[in-house]
Amino acid sequence: LADHNARAAAGSRVELSIAVLEKGSEVGAHGISGAIVDPRSLRELFPDKFSAIPFEAEVGREHLWWLTQEKALSLPEPPQLKNHGNYVASLGKLVKWMAKEVAALGVDIFCEFPGRTLLYEDTAAGKGRRVAGVRTGDKGIGKDGKRKSNFEPGVDIRSQMTVLGEGPRGTLAKQLDSRYGLSAGKNPQVYALGIKEVWELPQGRFEPGEIWHTMGWPMWPDHFGGGFIYGMQENFLIVGLVYGLDYENPLDDPHLEFQRLKTHPSIAQLLAGGTMSYYGAKAIPESGYWAMPKLGGDGFCLIGDSGGFVDGQRLKGIHLAVKSGMLAAESIFAAALAGKPLSSAGDAYPVHFESSWARQELWKSRNFHQGFERGGFDAMVNAALGTITGGLGFGLFDRLPAEAGHERLRR
């Protein structure tokens, strides 16, 4: 869309006004450092500037460990976990670089503008109401809920098309789901907690781009998840744990399990003499294709985690989030070229997704997470048979049912 505007400025087309609302104090404020990025969508988005993207390093040495409480057994990586050709990246650095690129093309970025509620208006055909923009949150509200001297009321930002990339369980996306039933007939979305720490270690402890993934202790066989360690530049190391929130025991503590993971002899040896610099955590939508909500409608699109664009089998979602944004933009661009209302792109966007490589990737892992409801051993069998059969559950079923995470909790 920004490229369309650049050409429109030359007089060939009507220019569109594009704005990004960022709830953080700056772009990247909510991006937790350290991730492995499949570069496919970024190569498509920045074909002439790909070499300028500030990745930390291309993935080099890869390790997969099966952990017992005292030992680390090296395993061969299954196809889904092989990362040759992928990159270790700081998500904060990546999105800041992208923000500069789009700002240079005339996109307005407004930081510290959280969306509080959606705006609606009657459709021209009189067949209901469409999304017509966002009302931002008030500023200058005290802890007691009263207005302070610096109070500023929220503003109404009207738009023909509203694209929501709020992450999992976003405020506005939940409003849309409640109003339009976007998740009707879908599997329930199940979440995991991704916990990360950034460590600064002595020189020579690891190579930038060196990565580890762990299975087994301290979670096996009752919990979905595993550990990860990524080597970055300047002796910084990412260590983290993905912990499924669909556990049965109400006393489970994901943060405590992460601390236990770091006491494993092989990991403790890696971290010895280092300093923990940063900490963060975020929710991850893990249920896959069958839990994705309806992705668009009159005046709106859902992208990234808001739309469930995560491949749990590959442990990746950034490239899918980028591709979902591209598909939404292409749908809006097509509506503009055809002289149609931009709001109509919300219906075209899901169709474009279904014919994209992003859909093909998510289709292959459509039954991956459901296998973990039956325990770790069944999950491994399901994953292996799904790989052979193109994603069939246990090699037989096109769609495995799923339980919401809270329904599995013992009371």
Can you annotate each of these PLM segments?
Residues 54-59, 64-68, 358-411:
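Ferredoxin-type iron-sulfur electron-transfer modules and their immediate structural context
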Residues 88, 306-319:
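Glycine-rich phosphate/pyrophosphate-binding beta-alpha loops
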Residues 3, 11-15, 19, 23, ...:
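Predominantly flavin-linked oxidoreductase catalytic cores and closely associated redox partners
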Residues 4-7, 11-70, 172, 360:
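N-terminal FAD cofactor-binding segment of flavoenzymes
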Residues 26-33, 39, 44, 57-93, ...:
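Redox-cofactor-proximal catalytic regions of oxidoreductases
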Residues 269-280, 340-346:
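Flexible, glycine/charged-enriched surface loops at secondary-structure junctions
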Residues 11-16, 308-314, 326, 330-379:
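Active-site-proximal substrate-binding core of FAD-dependent oxidoreductases
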Residues 281-312:
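FAD-binding beta-loop-beta segment adjacent to the flavin cofactor pocket
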